[in-house]
A protein has these predicted regions:
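Extracellular glycan-interacting surfaces
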Residues: 1-181
Length: 181
């Protein structure tokens, strides 16, 4: 059943997500970097005070990745040229911390993660990245074999233990995790 909820955000919605653990938690990131969260299925919204996150790409937007393991953990990504390209919240977006160690100033188009959140993948303007939670750092995945170009999308496919990245003009690139990850 479709039910339109009226709410005036401070800008155009650039990304929207629902918690996979409890879909009554909803998240919005606007094109001007404002983050909003709802705890009641979108009936009421709160803005993160004193926070401006990454803005989105003019055509592609920004990205929100709610954790599938920890209720309240939310990752956001977007333009990181004058601020961090990725942030994380542990409390549904009431406040955020930068998450940029090892990640250069770039534009993050999409985030995805392993089911346990131990690895966060980022499709960026300058290549594919992975954040290792146990090291609290981002690492470039391209090495010598991946195309050197923009990576627009990423999805983690748990059935085959693979992060699948989509590039701009060079096809699909799979990063397969072995049993030691």
């Amino acid at each position: 059943v479709y039910d339109e909820q009226n709410y005036i955000f401070s800008g155009t919605i650039s990304a929207l997500a629902f918690s996979p653990i409890d879909p009554s938690y909803r998240y919005v990131l606007t094109e001007n970097g404002r983050f909003y969260y709802s705890t009641d299925s979108g009936l009421n919204w709160s803005a993160t005070p004193m926070f401006t996150g990454p803005s989105g790409h003019y055509f592609y937007g920004s990205t929100i990745l709610p954790s599938s393991t920890y209720l309240g953990r939310v990752y956001i990504g977007g333009s990181g040229y004058s601020n961090s390209p990725v942030y994380v919240s542990q409390n549904h977006g009431q406040n955020f911390s930068e998450m940029n160690l090892g990640l250069p100033n770039t534009l993050v188009f999409e985030l995805s993660s392993t089911l346990d959140d131990n690895i966060i993948f980022a499709a960026t303007e300058i290549g594919p990245y992975a954040y290792l939670a146990n090291q609290e750092e981002w690492f470039l995945l391209s090495g010598l074999s991946a195309p050197d170009q923009t990576y627009w999308s990423v999805d983690f496919i748990p059935e085959i233990n693979t992060a699948r990245f989509g590039t701009y003009g060079r096809g699909i690139w799979d990063f397969v995790l072995d049993e030691n990850y």
